[in-house]
Amino acid sequence: MSISKAIAADLLEIKAVSLSPSQPFTWASGIKSPIYTDNRVTLAYPEVRSQIEGAFAELIKAEFPEVEVIAGTATAGIPHGAIIADYLKLPFAYIRSKPKDHGAGNQVEGRVTKGQKMVVVEDLISTGGSVLEAVAAAEREGADVLGVVAIFTYELEKANRKFADAGVKLATLTTYSELIEIAKETGYVTKEELELLKKFKENQETWQN
């Protein structure tokens, strides 16, 4: 089994990702979704956590070999980013969702020098909006952002467009497509549920019709 499929299987096993096509979850945006993800759960499982951080380190070395600093997004990207930075023996910073309203008013915490080559760590890519805002904040501070890495992506077309429009490279450990196939192979979902999950990826508004 490939590392991406192994991680997808782990996410299902520890219930970091839950699938429920027949009783959908409601996202904050109001969208009815057959999937819910809380990758913070991975931190509670040392073996899973170690595999994820090791895979992140290898992914970054392969995709972004010039990296000089790792930055985590607040809050979910911070623990993963800090562990990855330790693996790679690199400096670590983190990026707030908005600047502090006191003190120095920093949005990027840590020491980032102008032109320093950065990789931003996120746990999940949904629409991509929040992590791309973090990238923009880091660039305003002078960082040269090489790209974004994440544990998992829903592979939504709107996110793909946003990354393409921003000119930001995205690399993930595993994907929605891989995860739902693993879910079918392991009996987590039925063939009929798999078809609903595929429809959700194609169109988040009409998948239930």
Swiss-Prot record:
What's the short name of a Pfam family annotated to this entry?
Pribosyltran
List the molecular function annotations (GO) for this entry.
magnesium ion binding; orotate phosphoribosyltransferase activity
User: Which residues does orotate bind?
Assistant: 126
Keywords in UniProt for this one? Glycosyltransferase, Magnesium, Pyrimidine biosynthesis, Transferase
Catalyzed chemical reaction(s): orotidine 5'-phosphate + diphosphate = orotate + 5-phospho-alpha-D-ribose 1-diphosphate
Instruction: List the InterPro entries hit by this protein, alphabetically.
Output: OPRT, Or_phspho_trans_dom, PRibTrfase_dom, PRTase-like
Cofactor(s) the protein requires to work? Mg(2+)
Residues reported to bind 5-phospho-alpha-D-ribose 1-diphosphate: 96, 100, 102, 122-130
Does the UniProt entry include the keyword Transmembrane helix? no
Give EC number(s), comma-separated: 2.4.2.10
The Gene Ontology biological process terms listed for this entry are:
'de novo' UMP biosynthetic process; pyrimidine nucleobase biosynthetic process
| Keyword Amino-acid biosynthesis appears in the UniProt entry | no
Pathway(s) it belongs to: Pyrimidine metabolism; UMP biosynthesis via de novo pathway; UMP from orotate: step 1/2
Function description: Catalyzes the transfer of a ribosyl phosphate group from 5-phosphoribose 1-diphosphate to orotate, leading to the formation of orotidine monophosphate (OMP).
- Quote the subunit structure annotation: Homodimer.
Family classification: Belongs to the purine/pyrimidine phosphoribosyltransferase family. PyrE subfamily.
Which HAMAP family does this chain map to?
A: PyrE (MF_01208)
Q: Which PANTHER family match?
A: OROTATE PHOSPHORIBOSYLTRANSFERASE, URIDINE 5'-MONOPHOSPHATE SYNTHASE
Give the protein's recorded name.
Orotate phosphoribosyltransferase
Per the UniProt record, the source organism is Lactococcus lactis subsp. lactis (strain IL1403)
Record gene name: pyrE
